[in-house]
Amino acid sequence: IFMQAQIEYDVNPNIPLILNNFYVDECVNFMKNNIMDDSIDLTLTSPPYDNLRIYNGFIFNFKEIAIELYRITKKGGVVVWVVGDKIKNGNKSLTSFKQALYFQKIGFNVHDVMIYAKKNTPFMRSNAYTNSYEYMFVFSKGKPKTFNPIKEPTVRNGMEMLVANKGSDAKNNKVLKELKKEKTKSNIWYYAVGLGGTTNDKEAFQHPAVYPEQLALDHILSWSNEGDIVFDPMCGSGTTCKMAFLSNRNFIGVDISEEYIEIAKNRLKKYKG
């Protein structure tokens, strides 16, 4: 594991920001006071949505967060917004799409709408199919400057097939052609959830909503490169920051809850030395 040094990043002459560190603060306040324009390569976060997640009684100011994220994101940078919708009286809120439209309104491109599909979701509904997914909106500031596609084996990996190849004599000649061994993944990503699926860090589940470490890693590898800055403005128990650090990216983790920041710090202690 590459051990990154803590680097001073002078975004505010009065408050030098240290990379690879956690901060207890309200994220809009933190961004306004500490992060320069066009300085973040990738933001990966999962905000509290509707009233499904009780976030220690704190207020979630979505519009201000979105505006600040646009300001601090580099040209070509990406924001991955992992979010779901409340279902009340059989009616989905669609808050996720309302938020996506607002991101688009303030200047982001909606580069992709991806699906985080949960393999073993415990939630059952009596009069509808089990709700087992969340959205992963990929917003970009212009065209993404980085895309490292994740590959997966093809169904017919290593097989050959006969194809018709018309030669100079205008006759079809059948030739063997080896099929591609791998392909780029689709935008529906499947993950097991719960202890052993989401993470093996038991302390992480003191936070009400933890997404899988592999999900975080897949996005970090896709939309950033080594040495880039990965930001999580609502870092909770620190999954984004942990996986950024372990993949040789710099991270900034912010959360308004001191309790959650302590959990995040403890998860990284074994790696940071």
Where are these regions (language model features)?
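Core catalytic lobe of class I
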Residues: 1-265, 269-271
